[in-house]
């Protein structure tokens, strides 16, 4: 009898980790959580901004047009450098074949 009374007291104690009591049966529109950690991650989701670098957080504060323009310019620069490297590689292979007459079947050239 004392054990039952002690168990009831343990069940009535407030939760100390900051979680509130939820009914086990669910309710309207409530889907039971399959995993406690998943539910915890869901509660933490709105506080994700600390993970994002400052540049990206500041993008949402009104400077989106300028940042998009900078991003597009960076992408154009990357594409230009990639084309230049591919062309240089192709020219090296072709010039080497013309002068050496060696077989370069293992090398390839990506032309844009």
Curated annotation (Swiss-Prot):
> Any keyword Metal-binding?
yes
Motif Nuclear export signal per UniProt: ranges: 78-88
Q: What is its main location?
A: nucleus
Tell me the residue numbers annotated for binding Zn(2+): 109
Gene Ontology terms, MF aspect: metal ion binding; molecular function inhibitor activity; signaling receptor binding
Instruction: Give me the ranges of the annotated region His cluster.
Output: 101-105
Give the keywords, sorted: Apoptosis, Cytoplasm, Metal-binding, Nucleus, Ubl conjugation, Zinc
Looking at the record's lineage, which domain of life comes first?
Eukaryota
Segments of this protein annotated with the region Interaction with p75NTR/NGFR: 69-94
Record localization: Nucleus; Cytoplasm, Cytosol
> What family is reported?
Belongs to the BEX family.
Functional summary from the UniProt entry: May be a signaling adapter molecule involved in NGFR/p75NTR-mediated apoptosis induced by NGF. Plays a role in zinc-triggered neuronal death. In absence of reductive stress, acts as a pseudosubstrate for the CRL2(FEM1B) complex: associates with FEM1B via zinc, thereby preventing association between FEM1B and its substrates.
> Can you say what this protein is called?
Protein BEX3
Instruction: Give the species.
Output: Bos taurus (Bovine)
């Amino acid at each position: 009898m004392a054990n039952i009374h002690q168990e009831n007291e343990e069940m009535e104690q407030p939760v100390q980790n900051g979680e509130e009591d939820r009914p086990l049966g669910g309710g309207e529109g409530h889907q039971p959580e399959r995993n406690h950690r998943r539910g915890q991650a869901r509660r933490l989701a709105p506080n994700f901004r600390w993970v994002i670098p400052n540049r990206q957080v500041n993008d949402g504060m009104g400077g989106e047009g300028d940042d998009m323009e900078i991003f597009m310019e960076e992408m154009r620069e990357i594409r230009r450098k990639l084309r230049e490297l591919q062309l240089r590689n192709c020219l090296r292979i072709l010039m080497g074949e013309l002068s050496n007459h060696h077989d370069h079947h293992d090398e390839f050239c990506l032309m844009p």
